Amino acid sequence: NEYQNRYRAVFPIKVNQQRLVVEEVFRAGANFGFGLEVGSKPELLVVMSLTQNDDRPIICNGFKDDSYIQAVVLAMKLGRKIIPVIENFMELQLLLKHAKEHGVRPQLGVRVKLSSEGAGRWRDSGGDKSKFGLFITEVLEVVHQLKQADLLDCLKLVHCHIGSQLQDIRRVKEAVTELAHIYAELYKLGAGLEYLDIGGGLGVDYDGSRTNYDSSMNYTLVEYASDVVYRIANVLNSRKVPHPEIISESGRAMAAHHSVLVFNVLGASVLDQFKVDATPPEVELPQPCLLYTSDA
């Protein structure tokens, strides 16, 4: 696809918080600059002990209260490559407040509610009816506030979450195309964008059927990657916008195969305990009532 930038994966530690798993995934991605994603202040503190390399990104999602935002800003002051993703205006105000107090020019991202919906069991976590993220009009208000604070160049990332365990590749194509158009528009408005975060959703073919069912997916990993890269490049080339780094948060696909649960079958229930004969027993059945009329 001749894409003119790189790809990074970030591992959401909420997928599996076991220390051995997180450390192994983080170590395996060292040569590729892979990072970690956190959804709370405690997770951020855990990740801080791992990310000694300033080039490994930390993406901060989830609801962010005052203490969470303050921890993020202090991590920035230590030189960590940390990007809080803004999901409401309160988070933006807290970030601007603490950044001013500590003399930090913060890097930040915005999570966008797309009109494109996911599919399957977690479809409500994406789309414009999702409880997370900002509508397009709200994103424009964030841009306006950052511009007033002379921090528009600090808007580095655009993020969306389509859904989890996406079994239909068409949903991915639609969402990525829409997100790329939003990225291009924000770039044209003067934002200092560098990253496009497509969130999670990469499925796992649990039953091996390669079908459009909740426990499977109708695409391969190669097809997923090709479609994502092609759609982003195609949109941005048409808008004459530089290619960003692509980030994904495919925690399920990264960790699902690391272990298998094996257990003994203790019992089973059957449905054919009681049998009904096909022919009823010979009993005296009610006879039809016939009415006769006579010509008198």
Please name every model-derived segment.
Residues R8-Y195, V204, Y219-E223, R231:
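Active-site-proximal beta-alpha core segment in soluble small-molecule metabolic enzymes
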Residues H159-H161, Y195-G203, H243-H258:
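A glycine-rich phosphate-binding loop feature that marks nucleotide/adenosyl-phosphate handling sites
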Residues L166-E174, D205-E223, A253-A268:
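Short glycine/threonine-rich loop-to-helix capping motif typified by GTGT followed
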Residues H243, S269, Q273-P281:
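Catalytic or ion-translocation cores adjacent to nucleophile or general acid/base/metal-coordination motifs
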Residues P286-P288:
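Charged, amphipathic alpha-helical linkers/stalks
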Residues Y292-A296:
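Conserved small/polar residues in nucleotide/adenosyl-binding loops
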